[in-house]
Swiss-Prot record:
The keyword Kinase does not apply. Forms a heterotetramer with UvrB during the search for lesions. This is UvrABC system protein A. SUPFAM superfamilies: P-loop containing nucleoside triphosphate hydrolases. Keywords: ATP-binding, Cytoplasm, DNA damage, DNA excision, DNA repair, DNA-binding, Excision nuclease, Metal-binding, Nucleotide-binding, Repeat, SOS response, Zinc, Zinc-finger. The keyword DNA damage applies. Coiled coil: none annotated. Residues 308-589, 609-937 form the ABC transporter domain. It comes from Streptococcus pyogenes serotype M1. GO terms for molecular function: ATP binding; ATP hydrolysis activity; DNA binding; excinuclease ABC activity; zinc ion binding. GO terms for cellular component: cytoplasm; excinuclease repair complex. ATP binds at residues 32-39, 641-648. One of its GO terms (biological process) is SOS response.
Length: 942
């Protein structure tokens, strides 16, 4: 077998016909500037070809289900293995997908509970066991010798009535005695029972004394009792003790029944096990009273009920007024001053009580009717569930929130599944074990107390669970719970979860391609991640990791630097070799940073801010431990801490949502906190994340930053356009008129090929230029609109230098380091880091008020150290204008450049949620308890 992967003539995207050799069974890091072609090499060439060759080997029937693989633009690749890609984009947003289901740990947990779990009665009557007649006989014979007993068959349990037919049937079956409510009677002499009281009736099957030779008689009596008692039987030992037995998993006292224990009972995705109220989601969409009555100081007449404020018709306000008049509720009293009874009437309706409703609509239609009053909450619920209009449903959804299901308390399962415990009655049910952090879960498994028989059954299952949990622990995810929804994980977290699943599969000879697995990881956890990667390599796998993290690069066996620039200035291999060899390479920008020739300097002084603060008191969402936090305004603030310490909860769930609620009237509820002050000092909140700037290829840098409007204005003002009577709209590829109608302005046409990949071909009419020939006859400085869209930002800056309005907007795109992108590049082809910087660019050219708060969650994702240097310059421009920039970040170059650090921790999950250190980087570096401070100290001394 070859010991190298040899690539000849790779041309995907911006790759310039490159040849490269990659050693097999090694940890290989591919690095380079954002947009240099790293992903084009790793994912679009190597992974695409490895995957395609594997799929090609399958039958045509199987291929149709797998989607089709396009052959990458490369001459040849030798030495490939089947490839598995672990990237960031493929996290499931399905609410049924959790950490437990993604890692398959749930499958093993379900098996564990089905095999060694014991059901306990939910009404507190102890363990529920199922016994065969044979087992019951053995237990009875184990009683002390000479024990006197009677065998009873329960036929009525806690039921009202006189039960005359029951006694007739008992007599008919030939039985003589019965026990009614604890007293023994001859079946013909039972006193008349009270109709309105609950009664218990048992048939006396046999009376025995425990001694040798009774087994056969006892067995017959037990079988008869089970038959008559529907699988239940009681042994009364005459000394006041009673033993209850059942052939079913059913409580002999109250009858609570559990089906046979099997894995599907513990699945919240199967109707058999899921909670019937929330269908296994753990949350239920309920009307939120805070959204229905946003301002309780208003009266009903002033519009206290938000859903019924008149928008298009006066129907609901009229109904409300007539109903309140009928039921005697004052429309002018503030809502909060109404009595509880009156508020209930307004919210939940009048029940059966009716009022007379008379209404005439705008078209003369009339209603004259006596009806019950529905109540606003009931009305919102009904309209949400019954409407056929998406618009109405969305409006009603605005008054609802997802609340924890009251039936299953968020555990997602039904009572029958949640009554099964492992480790005795004081043990845990499957819902509780899923709520534990992975670190606590591991500890619980180690302390699990099982009988010898249970241990034998559980050993292989527990080993599988333990291994998978250990992998999650080793990649820095010890703070997650198995019940955590997969959709709420960050890109780095979901990638490391899939990494743990792959390590658990113990495959060898596979080619793994990873996309920045260190994202969202604190330096402290990075070493464990690198160890995990080395473990995968040592199993005999090849790992190709696209990464910018210096530690990972230095620990790699082989380093490939793609560059030298980005976009059309990249696409070449600038250096390839061991990390030490690359560090000595003068052509490699990465090498210059690794050797310390280039570095991001520490700012000479820290800003003092404007003296104002946003202060949050009592932040207690998720693992935050009732924090009081001050965010100084007019500064560059970094929120730091190990993974899972509560950074995103504090910034995204509380601060961002609370500010958005006050400034933008956002309906999204912030997390739990006591109070927030200082929002009046800011006017705008700008959240700059890495989500795509457009979902379709029609969105591009020119349309997103707004510069395309100005360019179209410019073309409309040319003499040729004026002569032809073309307005600005003529130069849009989104509307009829100027665009090519053959491809609707897309420039490409999709041809479906069924068993072969869909083929995208340039439109034959416009040849990919999007516009019709008449539009393209209008020129500005010798270029038509299609040629302008094909220009890179750098070229466009020179071309439009004489028009300040356009040049200013294009300059901002260059300032964020995207000079290599073309103005018309489809938004769908931009990476997360590029999309984020495009958002920054569109903010840069807006007039600054100096009162904006910018929030960025890990802005360095996908960025090379050289890109980070540029990003910092842009962020500092915002702060120099008097604005506040708040970043959640692990990158030490960014952290050391901040004016103020808020470090959370000390650990992740339950061990976090506290403030470990605050202050300038120099101050935080002195705090011994701070992991961030420890790494920062080294960085500041470099």
């Amino acid at each position: 077998m070859q010991n190298k992967i040899i690539i000849h003539g790779a041309r995907a995207h911006n790759l310039k016909n490159i040849d490269v050799e990659i050693p097999r069974d090694k940890l290989v890091v591919v690095t380079g500037l954002s947009g240099s072609g790293k992903s084009s090499l790793a994912f679009d060439t190597i992974y695409a070809e490895g995957q395609r060759r594997y799929v090609e080997s399958l039958s045509a029937y199987a291929r149709q289900f797998l989607g089709n693989m396009e052959k990458p633009d490369v001459d040849s690749i030798d030495g490939l293995s089947p490839a598995i890609s672990i990237d960031q984009k493929t996290t499931s947003k399905n609410p049924r997908s959790t950490v437990g289901t993604v890692t398959e740990i749930n499958d093993y947990l379900r098996l564990l509970y089905a095999r060694v779990g014991t059901p306990y009665c939910i009404n507190g009557h102890g363990a529920i066991t199922a016994s065969s007649a044979e087992q019951i006989v053995e237990q009875v014979l184990a009683l002390p010798e000479r024990t006197r007993m009677q065998i009873l068959a329960p036929v009525v349990r806690r039921k009202k009535g006189q039960h005359k037919t029951v006694f007739e049937k008992i007599q008919k079956d030939g039985y003589v005695r019965v026990r009614v409510d604890g007293d023994i009677f001859d079946v013909t002499e039972v006193p008349e029972l009270s109709k309105s009281k609950m009664h218990n009736i048992e048939v006396v099957i046999d009376r025995l004394v425990n001694k040798d030779g009774i087994r056969s008689r006892l067995f017959d009596s037990v079988e008869a009792a089970l038959r008559l008692g529907d699988g239940y039987l009681m042994i009364d030992t005459m000394d006041g003790n009673e033993l209850l037995f059942s052939e079913h998993y059913s409580c002999p006292v109250c009858g609570f029944t559990v089906p046979e224990l099997e894995p599907r009972l513990f699945s919240f995705n199967a109707p058999f096990g899921s909670c019937p109220t929330c269908d296994g989601l753990g949350i239920k969409l309920e009307v939120d009273l805070d959204l229905v009555v946003p301002d309780p100081s208003k009266s009903l007449r002033e519009g206290a009920l938000a859903p019924w404020n008149p928008i298009s018709s006066n129907y609901y306000p009229t109904m409300l007024e007539q109903a309140m008049a009928s039921f005697g509720v004052d429309m002018d009293t503030p809502f909060e001053a109404l009595t509880e009874e009156e508020r209930d009437l307004v919210l939940y309706g009048s029940g059966d009580r009716e009022f007379h409703f008379h209404y005439v609509n705008d078209f003369g239609g009339e209603r004259n009717i006596d009806i019950p009053f529905e109540g606003v909450v009931t009305n919102v619920n009904r309209r949400y569930h019954e409407t056929n209009s998406d618009y109405t449903r969305n409006v009603m959804r605005g008054y609802m929130n997802e609340l924890t299901c009251a039936t299953c308390h968020g555990y997602r399962l039904n009572d029958q599944a949640l009554c099964v415990h492992v480790g005795g009655e004081e043990g845990t049910h499957i819902g509780q074990i899923s709520e534990l952090s992975i670190a606590d879960h591991l500890q619980l498994l180690e302390e699990l107390e099982l009988t010898e028989n249970e241990s034998t059954i559980a050993k292989p299952i527990v080993k599988e669970i333990h291994d998978r949990l250990t992998f999650l622990n080793n990649v820095g995810l010890n703070y997650l719970t198995l019940s955590r929804a997969a959709g709420t994980l960050s890109g780095g977290e979901s990638q490391r979860i899939r990494l743990a699943t792959q390590i658990g599969s113990n495959l060898s000879g596979v080619l793994y391609i990873l996309d920045e697995p260190s994202i969202g990881l604190h330096q402290r956890d990075n070493d464990r991640l690198i160890e995990s990667l080395k473990k995968m390599r040592d199993l005999g796998n090849t790992l190709i990791v696209v990464e910018h993290d210096e530690d990972t690069m230095m620990q790699a066996d082989w380093l490939i630097d793609v560059g030298p620039g980005a976009g059309e200035f990249g696409g070449e291999i600038t250096a390839s070799g061991t990390p030490k060899q690359v560090a000595k390479n003068k052509k490699s920008i990465t090498g210059q940073y690794l050797s310390g020739k280039k570095f991001i300097p520490v700012p000479l002084e820290r800003r003092s801010g404007n003296g104002r603060f946003i202060e949050i008191k009592g932040a207690a969402q998720n693992n935050l431990q009732s924090l009081d936090v001050r965010f100084p305004l007019g500064k560059f603030i970094a929120v730091t801490g190990v993974s899972g310490s509560g950074k995103s909860t504090l910034v995204n769930s509380i601060l961002k949502k609370a500010v958005a609620q006050k400034l933008n009237r956002n309906a999204d509820k912030p997390g739990k906190y006591h109070s927030i002050s200082g929002i009046e000092h800011i006017e705008r909140l700008i959240d700059i994340d890495q989500s795509p700037i457009g979902r379709t290829p029609r969105s591009n840098p020119a349309t997103y930053t707004g510069v395309f409007d100005d360019i179209r204005d410019l073309f409309a003002q040319t003499n040729e356009a004026k002569i032809r009577g073309y307005k600005k709209g003529r130069f849009s590829f989104n509307v009829k008129g100027g665009r090519c109608e053959a491809c609707s302005g897309d420039g490409i046409i999709k041809i479906e090929m069924h068993f072969l990949p869909d083929v995208y071909v340039p439109c034959e009419v416009c040849h990919g230029r999007r516009y019709n020939s008449e539009t393209l006859e209008v020129h500005y400085k010798g270029k038509n609109i299609a040629e302008v869209l094909d220009m890179t930002v750098d070229d466009a800056l020179v071309f439009f230098s004489a028009i300040p309005k356009i040049a200013r907007k294009i300059q901002t795109i260059k300032d964020v380091g995207l000079g290599y992108v073309t103005l018309g590049q489809p938004a769908t082809t931009l990476s997360g880091g590029e999309a984020q910087r495009m958002k920054l660019a569109s903010e840069l050219h807006k007039r600054s008020t100096g009162k904006s708060l910018y929030i960025l969650d890990e802005p360095t994702t996908g960025l090379h150290t050289d890109d980070i240097a540029r990003l910092l310059k842009v962020l500092e421009r915002f702060v120099d204008d008097g604005n506040t920039v708040l970043v959640i970040e692990h990158n030490l170059d960014v952290i050391k450049s901040a004016d103020h650090i808020i470090d959370l921790g000390p650990e992740g999950g339950d061990g976090g949620g506290q403030i470990v250190a605050t202050g300038t980087p120099e101050e935080v570096a002195q705090v011994k308890e701070s992991y961030t401070g420890h790494y920062l100290k080294v960085k500041l001394q470099q």
